[in-house]
Structure formats: structure tokens, C-alpha cells
Amino acid sequence: MTGWVDRLRRGWQRRQFRNSEWRFLFDAPPPGEWVALDCETTGLNTRTDEIIAIGAVRIVGQRILTSERLELLVRPEGDVPAESIRVHRLRAQDVQAGVSTEEAMRQL
């Protein structure tokens, strides 16, 4: 029963999404495939803090495809607070050579 509900929800979400470049994100995923995603941020406030690192790895069935992993440093617009450095060990000088947020989303 949830199959048709999921398809209906994805269709509605796709129509609501104005930027057609990203509409594929609402397509049904391939069966048995997943992506494990990890993000490091400058803090926990979704309105003010930024992503500064993204890691992703593809999983197919029971296999983790480490050869298809993605590791990105993302250049923040603001500062990297000392509190977040203690958590993920990424300093401002580590992420300054990173890609822009927009480029990171495209690569992801």
C-alpha cells in the first residue's frame, strides 16, 4: 500500500520543486542501492551554520563501494568556530581551498 503513496508524494514534491536541475532527486531510487552521507558543519543551527565537509559512499546490496566514495571540503562564507574545530578537527585553513557550496552540491 505504501508504494503508491510514495509515488504520489514524490510526484507532488517534484512538481513543487522550482529548480528543474534538482528534480531528479525525487525520482524513485534504484532497488537495493543507497548512499551513506556524512556532513561536517560549523555548528548545529540550520539557519546560520554552514556545511564544511561532505563524505558519501555508494552501497549496492550488501557491498559498500569504497572505490565510489566522495570526499569534499567546502569553503565556508563565514568563520569556523573553535567549538566546531574541537568536534571535527577541520580548521579555517583546511577548508579555505575547498569548493563552493554550489559546486559541492553538484558533485554530490
Task: Label each residue range with its predicted role.
Residues 4, 11-108:
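Conserved non-catalytic scaffold segment of RNase H-like nuclease domains
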